[in-house]
Regions:
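A contiguous pocket-lining binding segment that forms or flanks enzyme active sites
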Residues: 173-178
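Positively charged n-region of N-terminal signal peptides that target proteins for export
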Residues: 1-4
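N-terminal signal peptide c-region/cleavage motif recognized by signal peptidases
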Residues: 14-19
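Sec-dependent N-terminal signal peptides
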Residues: 6-10
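Transmembrane beta-barrel domains of Gram-negative outer membranes and organellar outer membranes
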Residues: 20-155, 159-164, 179-256
Length: 256
C-alpha cells in the first residue's frame, strides 16, 4: 500500500515542475487525446508531459509521457478508485503503458497518422471482467487533420482493438472527434466512441456509444486545465440517467 501511494504521489509532486499549455491557438504541442480517444498527436522529442484525470467515484488516474525520439513517445500511468473520499482505496491491478509511433506527418492534403498501444483504461476496474469502466484503447491507429477556420478546427478518427475482452465483446472499435479553438487559450473538444467493443455479452454499454464533450484552458506558462462531460447519451447500463463530470490537468516541459 505504501509503495502504491508513493508511486501516485510522485505524479502529483511532478505536476509543480512541468509546464507548457495546450488549449487554444497558442498551443505549443500536439494533443494526444481529446478526452478518452487517442489522436495522431505525439510528444515532441525531449519534452515530457504529466497529466491527471479526476472522475466520479473518487477515481484519479495520473500519467507521464516522454518524447524519446522524433516521432516516438513512451508513457506510463497508474491510478485507482475511491482515492478521493473515505474508505479503502481500490488501486488498479497494473500500471498502464502507452507507446506511439508517428508513421506519417500531416500535409496539405493528408492527415497525420500515428500507430500506438495504450493499456490504460479509466474509471473503476472490475476484477471479475478484467476491464475498466472505460476500456483501454489497446492497439490503435489514429489520424488527425487541422484546418484554419476562425482559429483552428481539427478532426480526428481512430480504429482500435482493446485487450479487455473477458466480458465477451471482442470487436474492433471506431471513434471520431474534433477540437475547435476559441481564442488563444481555450479549446472545445468532442468525441464519439461507437463502443462496438462494449455492447454485447457482459459488456457495460447498452449500444448507444459514448458521446463526450470537454473544454481546455491554457491558464499560463504551461498549465492546462480541463472539464469533461462523459456519456451524454446515457450508454452505461449502471448509474444511468446522467453524464459523468470530470477534471483534467496537464503540464509539459522540455527535459532534455
Amino acid at each position: 500500500m505504501k509503495r502504491k501511494i508513493t508511486f501516485l504521489g510522485i505524479f502529483f509532486i511532478a505536476i509543480v515542475v512541468f509546464a507548457q499549455g495546450s488549449g487554444g491557438t497558442n498551443a505549443k504541442y500536439e494533443e494526444r487525446y481529446l478526452i478518452d480517444m487517442p489522436t495522431a498527436g505525439i510528444m515532441t522529442k525531449g519534452y515530457s508531459a504529466v497529466s491527471m484525470d479526476v472522475m466520479p467515484d473518487g477515481v484519479v488516474m495520473s500519467k507521464i509521457e516522454v518524447g524519446i525520439y522524433d516521432g516516438f513517445s513512451f508513457g506510463i500511468s497508474y491510478g485507482g478508485s475511491n482515492i478521493i473520499g473515505s474508505g479503502q482505496i481500490d488501486w488498479y491491478k497494473l500500471p498502464g503503458i502507452n507507446v506511439r509511433v508517428r508513421v506519417m506527418d500531416e500535409t496539405v492534403l493528408l492527415p497525420a497518422l500515428t500507430l500506438g498501444f495504450d493499456s490504460q483504461g479509466k474509471g473503476e476496474y472490475y476484477s471479475d471482467l478484467e476491464r475498466y469502466q472505460i476500456k483501454s484503447p489497446g492497439f490503435f491507429a489514429a489520424g488527425s487533420k487541422n484546418f484554419e477556420f476562425l482559429g483552428y478546427f481539427s478532426v480526428h478518427g481512430m480504429i482500435n482493438y482493446t485487450l479487455e475482452r473477458k466480458d465477451g465483446d471482442k470487436n474492433l472499435n471506431l471513434g471520431f472527434g474534433f477540437e475547435k479553438t476559441v481564442g488563444g487559450k481555450v479549446s472545445i473538444v468532442g468525441e464519439y466512441d461507437f463502443a462496438f467493443n462494449d455492447h454485447v455479452g457482459s459488456a457495460l454499454g447498452k449500444g448507444n456509444g459514448y458521446l463526450n464533450l470537454g473544454a481546455r484552458w491554457s491558464v499560463g506558462d504551461g498549465l492546462t486545465l480541463g472539464l469533461n462531460l462523459r456519456d451524454l447519451l446515457d450508454n452505461k447500463r449502471f448509474d444511468s440517467n446522467h453524464a459523468d463530470r470530470g477534471i483534467f490537468v496537464e503540464y509539459v516541459k522540455p527535459v532534455f
